[in-house]
Amino acid sequence: NSVPTERLRMATLDVDPEASCSKLSTSPSNTSLTHRFLDNKFYLLVVIGEIVTEDHLRCAISDIERGIRSWDTDLISCNLDQELKLFVSRHSARFSADVRGQKILHHRSDVLETVVLINPSDEAVSTEVRLMITDAARHKLLVLTGQCCENTGELILQSGSFSFQNFIEIFTDQEIGELLSTTHPANKANLTLFCPEEGDWKNANLKKHNLQDFINIKLNSVSILPEMEGLSEFTEYLSESVEVPSSFDVLEPPASGGFLKLSKPCCYIFPGGRGDSALFAVNGFNMLINGGSDRRSCFWKLVRHLDRVDSILLTHNGADNLPGVNSLLQRKIAELEEEQSQGSTANSDWMKNLISPELGVVFLNVPENVTNLQPNFRVRRNTEETCLTLQYLNKLCVKPEPLFRTVGNVIDPVILFQKMGVGRLEMYILNSVKGSKELQFFMQHWSSNNKAKTGLILPNGKDAEISFPYLTSISSLIVWHPANPSEKIVRALFPGNAPQYNILDGLEKLKHLDFLKHPVVTQKELIASSAAPTVKQAKLKQWSDSKESLKSNSRPSVGKGVKKDVKEETPELTKPTAVSHQEAVNEKPQKVEKKEKPVVKKERPRTELQSKPEEKDAKAKADAAKQELEEKMQKDEKLKSESKPKPLKEKIVKKEVKAKKPEEKKKEEKDVKKESAKPDRKEEKAVIKKEKVKKEEKPKKEEVKKDVKKDVKKEVKKKGN
């Protein structure tokens, strides 16, 4: 459609940031009002949105009739009855090569230009509305029919939608702004708008957008015009022109055979319209997350080449994510019906319609007591889409599986797929929480559209609200652990429509997982990082042990080993030592306790005679005799010991009880000094030697005393004589 050159005029505009729409401004004072709308020209634009069933079509045709009759126009200047008959007989039709199912019907007379858009795209609607506003006709009528969204009132199209905001944004176009601002106020265009009575359309405040200063707009006026034969012919023809597409038309079969195999982890994000849709796949398993808001499923061109969709995750019950999946379920039901009706005609063309992926498990949180609601063919409601989903799943014998996060500090994953040599796919549920107040309320009042306050304050000072289906939306983290430890661990977060604080609360319970502590990580790197602290601690312990051993080696040898030897040898020391048979007989048995007595330096026993000066000579003689006797005994003892087998060196020292020679004693004293690190052992040896010498000296002292007494008597006699 080429735009006439007279319509293309420049415009200026001011943007109202609060309203997110434009505010037209007049041209400078020196700019003349050059544009003029023609009072005898009329323009009719009818938009028929997406039609799903025959019931939807009947509602749309009824709204078209109401919309045309609400047009406040002069039937004398424009014989509408006659003009509509001319349209039926003389219109032209154009089809789009890019948009399947889109059709544009057009007729232009000297008085009325009529354009009808059937099943158009959002781009086609915006283009035709622009052309209507810029047309020279002063009297314009825009009729928007079809299903609309529940909350916003957006007109649902086969791809996208047309909202009140889209309508306002058209006036921000520079060309349109210049055109309207250069028109004389007495010659302003008149626009009658028939639109859905829902959402933003219903609450539209045109004065807020300053449009009435440049164009006269009437919204959803009551029926003014009478019933007309031409109008009936017009609506009847449109009902015949609009085709309700079958499931195989909405989701076309693949042009070629064969299936697509996804061997590496991947995630496809599809344009889900007002919602979202994605396909996450690994080698051997795939998951479809939501289906988008379009009936013509955005994921179908890829999914139709798969042999199986292993799982479907529907995060919430909404009209923004269920329609795409419902189309897939509807197609699977149509395949069963087609197969039953066609029988065994395997060579027919209908066989290609049966090429579609098999369906696995479906995850969806819905109450068990869901009842079918009365359908509303003008408004697409969340609850109605949920009912359709459950009906289709029931026909396919598929039971939806619920997903909840259990209450606790740790979230256990759901194992979606696990195969030896391939890997493991886990799913952590972040929201919704089992047993929470929000979930309980949703299960009891699932059909309502109640909202909960979030505690957040909007810029306008009001509390932010969120609907319960969104508050209880499933939010999940999917993690792929490949069998090869050198491959990267893949993590994908699918938040659904859950509030951000609920998602963060769920992630807080996963902070202990090591694979979430790195931006990119492999299993091999995780093992290395976890082993590093252990190795470090082992090295520190080894270093401290070696340091302690160095300290102990640098100390004098008074250590535990010497004490241990002494303890082990103590029983040997308690045994009486036999020097000779005669000594053993003469020796009195002594107790063990005597050996433990401290060493005391013994003094020779004094007598009254020895204390006199004249007895010194006798004492010297006695000492000499004693020394000779000891030397003689040592020689005898040495001969005896040499004839016996030599015991261990340590025991020789301990068992040797004979009196040593002066040279040997000196040598022993030197050895003892060298072994000064062994004081305990030295003491014990000294005690043993003293005790044994004491035993030997007892009989000898008696003999010495007798000799001394004899010598003393002899000396006394000599002096007496």
UniProtKB/Swiss-Prot annotation:
The keyword DNA repair does not apply. Keywords: Membrane, Repeat. One of its GO terms (biological process) is axonogenesis. InterPro entries: MAP1, MAP1B/S_N. One of its GO terms (molecular function) is actin binding. GO terms for cellular component: cytosol; dendrite; endomembrane system; membrane; microtubule; microtubule associated complex; neuronal cell body; synapse. Sequence repeats lie at residues 563-565, 654-656, 666-668, 673-675, 681-683, 689-691, 694-696, 700-702, 705-707, 709-711, 713-715. Residues 563-715 are annotated as: 11 X 3 AA approximate repeats. It is found in: Endomembrane system. This is Electromotor neuron-associated protein 1.
